[in-house]
Amino acid sequence: MLSPKRTKFRKQHCGNLKGISTRGNVICFGKFPLQALEPSWITSRQIEAGRRAITRYARRGGKLWIRIFPDKPITIRPAETRMGSGKGSPEYWVAVVKPGKILYEISGVSENIARAAMKIAAYKMPIRTQFITTSSLNKKQEI
């Protein structure tokens, strides 16, 4: 599972998911990306499940880039505890994803294989996504 090696602070505020992604919304590394259409938190387990699905379908062909990293700690209080007594302890890590953010990029495989692999990975995500090609940025297909 992905998680930061060290952080300046152990706990964070919740924040908000308003607006669209201004960073990480252009194709940088691969040829076929998977782009988010909704705002959400994506856990490190979901990112890993998507990565496994893509690499297993591509069968060691091509190269995969993961464009998001879970750097936000989510805290959970123990069950049946009374109010007060501070914030809970960090349980897992999430990546904050806004609409337009690119989640994965793949290259070195055909478009059909990339589309099918990204479709399998899209089922693992808690949000709606779309598959984009570099040649046809105008006609985007929602997955």
Curated annotation (Swiss-Prot):
Disulphides: none
One Pfam family hit: Ribosomal_L16
UniProt KW Ribosomal protein keyword: yes
CDD domains: Ribosomal_L16_L10e
Keywords: Chloroplast, Plastid, Ribonucleoprotein, Ribosomal protein
SUPFAM superfamilies on file: Ribosomal protein L16p/L10e
Keyword match Ribosomal protein: yes
One example of a Gene Ontology biological process annotation: translation
GO-annotated molecular function: rRNA binding; structural constituent of ribosome
Places the protein is found: Plastid, Chloroplast
Predominant location: plastid
Cellular-component GO terms for this entry: chloroplast; ribonucleoprotein complex; ribosome
InterPro entries associated with the record: Ribosomal_uL16, Ribosomal_uL16_bact-type, Ribosomal_uL16_CS, Ribosomal_uL16_dom, Ribosomal_uL16_sf
Family of this protein: Belongs to the universal ribosomal protein uL16 family.
NCBIfam families in UniProt: rplP_bact
Subunit details: Part of the 50S ribosomal subunit.
PANTHER family given in the database record: 50S/60S RIBOSOMAL PROTEIN L16 (PTHR12220), LARGE RIBOSOMAL SUBUNIT PROTEIN UL16M (PTHR12220:SF13)
Entry protein name: Large ribosomal subunit protein uL16c
Organism lineage string: Eukaryota, Viridiplantae, Streptophyta, Embryophyta, Marchantiophyta
